[in-house]
Amino acid sequence: MIVLRSKSPRRKQILESLDLDFRIESEDIDESSLKDEHPLEYLKRISLSKLGTRSKDELLISCDTIVVQENSILQKPENFSQAIEMLERLSGKTHIVYSGLGIYYNRLEQFAFDSSKVHFHTWNKEQIKKYIERYSPFDKAGSYGVQDIEGPVQSFEGSYTNILGFPIRMFFQYHELWKKYLKGNQA
């Protein structure tokens, strides 16, 4: 069985849509960035840390998603004012979303990531406040969800599921590890 080390409902939905046999066991870790840590170094460190306790008999997968603008990481907002600040910063601009994938199986640890460009509408403070009140994006990096109707995303380039928080194109590259966990597969 696959063990998904994540609390994200979006990651759960994506794995369910792939018809995989998995269970959720999230690991709580300190997601603080280190001083002068490059965004991709941070992504790798956090994605692999989320793998948590290793089990040689199970396939463990973990993910982390970061929003990066001007080489600065925008994590999940801690409160309403921080969400406003992030969305004002992203308004009318383009940023990059990186999602990292940590995999542990048979004593081997691997990391891969994908990136997507996201273009935002130009929003005023009232539009931003209404969005936050309606969607409560406090569990999302950058304070937004690409899937939110009437959200701030104007367009994007790259993988939709990557922006949701699961780098599916990278996951597919490891199909030899996970194909036996397809429901109904006796391989």
Swiss-Prot record:
The UniProt keyword set, sorted, is: Cytoplasm, Hydrolase, Nucleotide metabolism
Kindly report, in one word, the top-level EC class recorded for this enzyme.
hydrolase
Reaction(s) catalysed (UniProt annotation): dTTP + H2O = dTMP + diphosphate + H(+); UTP + H2O = UMP + diphosphate + H(+)
Q: Coiled-coil region(s) at which residues?
A: none
Which CDD domains is this protein grouped with? Maf (cd00555)
Give this protein's Gene Ontology molecular function annotations.
Answer: dTTP diphosphatase activity; nucleoside triphosphate diphosphatase activity; UTP diphosphatase activity
| Catalytic activity, EC | 3.6.1.9
What is annotated as the active site? D64
Keyword flag Calcium: no
UniProt xrefs under SUPFAM superfamilies: ITPase-like (SSF52972)
Pfam families hit by this protein? Maf
Location of the protein in the cell: Cytoplasm
Family per UniProt? Belongs to the Maf family. YhdE subfamily.
The entry's protein name is dTTP/UTP pyrophosphatase
Task: Give the source species.
Answer: Leptospira interrogans serogroup Icterohaemorrhagiae serovar Lai (strain 56601)
